[in-house]
């Protein structure tokens, strides 16, 4: 029972870190990155489909992304989705592929993005701590119901605290890495 609760907690915390990693990867740095388009979705024959499934995305230069749709009919729809997104880039369409020049970020914009990264990191830490709180409540219930001994439950609480601390540190490292990427000129 206790092991199950701890295992579930670790699994959920890992998922929270994974979501944080994905959220942070969506924050645009000054460099071109194919991942910046992973959340863009277009209407493809009636169903919402990510651009990454409709085109190959390559980065031939540090500040240039080339998108080549598998289906040439979708060229305009992909271009429109990129233009209407919050990425702050302007795609150019040459009839067969889309070139996206990634402009250099201003110092002010870098600072905004660092704040955004810290906010996403804080959200992830809050979700990890909420997972910890729920498992602690479960452990207290187990102790109260007499399903496990006092020593077992307190050992499990210490393990849970250690696990929580490890995942919070992982999130801090992700945010610090992203901050370094953003502030690098």
Swiss-Prot record:
<dbReference type="GO" id="GO:0006415">
    <property type="term" value="P:translational termination"/>
</dbReference>
<keyword id="KW-0963">Cytoplasm</keyword>
<dbReference type="InterPro" id="IPR023584">
    <property type="entry name" value="Ribosome_recyc_fac_dom"/>
</dbReference>
<comment type="function">
    <text>Responsible for the release of ribosomes from messenger RNA at the termination of protein biosynthesis. May increase the efficiency of translation by recycling ribosomes from one round of translation to another.</text>
</comment>
<dbReference type="GO" id="GO:0005737">
    <property type="term" value="C:cytoplasm"/>
</dbReference>
<comment type="similarity">
    <text>Belongs to the RRF family.</text>
</comment>
<protein>
    <recommendedName>
        <fullName>Ribosome-recycling factor</fullName>
    </recommendedName>
</protein>
<dbReference type="Pfam" id="PF01765">
    <property type="entry name" value="RRF"/>
</dbReference>
<dbReference type="InterPro" id="IPR036191">
    <property type="entry name" value="RRF_sf"/>
</dbReference>
<dbReference type="InterPro" id="IPR002661">
    <property type="entry name" value="Ribosome_recyc_fac"/>
</dbReference>
<keyword id="KW-0648">Protein biosynthesis</keyword>
<dbReference type="GO" id="GO:0043023">
    <property type="term" value="F:ribosomal large subunit binding"/>
</dbReference>
